[in-house]
């Protein structure tokens, strides 16, 4: 594999053969650098560099090139013969599978000929499955090699794009790597731990929900039919839960089903509630397609509406309400827009007898070469009472909970070329190393720990737990409680919603002006929509569970997320939102795309008020 393709794959980017031949000559001539190309692809919000992206990039640097004849004719040499490259029509059909403007039926099929049956659309998105393994994306990016001779082959990624791939040669690991068996920290004998009785309850955990498999026409039905029905059940569940929340708002009145709009007389003002199938901005306003369990309708919200700015930020597949008038032309003209949102006023909770604190963290990434082990060990020493001031001594003596929100290890095979970024290349040893470190957390502190996308767990969310056969050392820690992603922990009567935070990716992709650099704002948008990852078919793989377990059914006192490696906080309508940063220093890829993590920052939360009272800074050891 040449350095051009190898460099792209190492940084998580794929390239089609036609794009390769467009770009490689200019790259070899030094007309652009790999960093420039990756930044350009990132600005287009894609990790696949096809001929369209390549042409745009070449124009931006003032260069163009003709395709070689064999590419024009649709063939690519692999060294093992020629293989046919799918034509544009085939690729368009394949890439339509990842469209976010999907339509999910939640009831009867609309009678209008213009509205395609929703299950047909889902079948197009998911594909026909004759049996065996599911074709639903699991988040794995590693392609299957089509031969076993170690040669270059053309393979296809999960989106159907062909790219040149050479199996990564992994040298036998000869040198020893750290598993931290020698890290032993005794509690400071001078620390006087305040006797506080623990009071916690796992209020919600994915594993506790009993899910019934969806009913299909016959027991011998195809796997694809079952998955389609599971997703349809998921969206019905979402609509039902969020419809109930919306109807608790006194302003959301006179609600009717979309199918009954045709019976509304004259200019009578009514409210509809449904899933957002699509959203389009025009010079005069926004046009939505909204669907409920009975039908679909086009909704127009004018630009001068007081809710226009809020409506502009709504994600595909979110559940919303519109108030307005139905036109006989089949368009609903809205004058108000409502999100499920958080109530303005909530009942105040009684004070606690004793001050008690919780520590929030995430994204430890044990196993990565960039894991800040010195900083993390300093943090463990701090928990054991080796502090720098009387104020810190008072706080640490009252800490009873440590909450870790996913990506506790760096994992294996998460992205192309990851092996070269690992100091611990074995997934079992990564969890053993983490357990050795966490065994130094004082026994009076309860650790809650859940999975993220780098962990050995189901890739699609919600994630019930770690795969125990890989993460067994964590399950053996006596003061540790394994939780799901998401989970709700009730601490002394206060509800803490813990999620890894992958939904932030979709918010940043769809909402102008929001970035990973300030994750508190995307977290607020998710809270307003009362959902942790609303968009189906976006960047976040969602499991085909018959019930939507990502709906925020009850308003928590605090929301903790991680994933983006940047510390940030926000308070929205009385809810504290915290992104708990990372223990991984900036990687080479992050440098190229200008992602600046904030490792070693640790928020301390007063459980009574559910507010961050202090942020510890261990970054100087990173």
From Swiss-Prot:
Compositionally biased intervals (Basic and acidic residues): 85-95
Pfam hit, one: Metallophos
Swiss-Prot/TrEMBL GO biological process terms: DNA catabolic process; DNA strand elongation involved in DNA replication
Ranges annotated as biased composition (Polar residues): 96-109
Gene3D superfamilies: 3.60.21.50, D-family DNA polymerase, DP1 subunit N-terminal domain, Nucleic acid-binding proteins
EC number: 2.7.7.7, 3.1.11.1
Reaction(s) the record says it catalyses: DNA(n) + a 2'-deoxyribonucleoside 5'-triphosphate = DNA(n+1) + diphosphate; Exonucleolytic cleavage in the 3'- to 5'-direction to yield nucleoside 5'-phosphates
GO molecular function: DNA binding; DNA-directed DNA polymerase activity; single-stranded DNA 3'-5' DNA exonuclease activity
Cellular-component GO terms for this entry: DNA polymerase complex
Domain of life the protein comes from: Archaea
Assigned keywords, A-Z: DNA replication, DNA-binding, DNA-directed DNA polymerase, Exonuclease, Hydrolase, Multifunctional enzyme, Nuclease, Nucleotidyltransferase, Transferase
Region of interest (Disordered), residue spans: 76-113
Keyword Transferase applies: yes
The protein's role, per its UniProt record: Possesses two activities: a DNA synthesis (polymerase) and an exonucleolytic activity that degrades single-stranded DNA in the 3' to 5' direction. Has a template-primer preference which is characteristic of a replicative DNA polymerase.
Binding partners and assembly: Heterodimer of a large subunit and a small subunit.
PANTHER family in the record: DNA POLYMERASE DELTA SUBUNIT 2
Family: Belongs to the DNA polymerase delta/II small subunit family.
NCBIfam families, per the entry: PRK04036.1-2, PRK04036.1-3
Name of the protein in its database record: DNA polymerase II small subunit
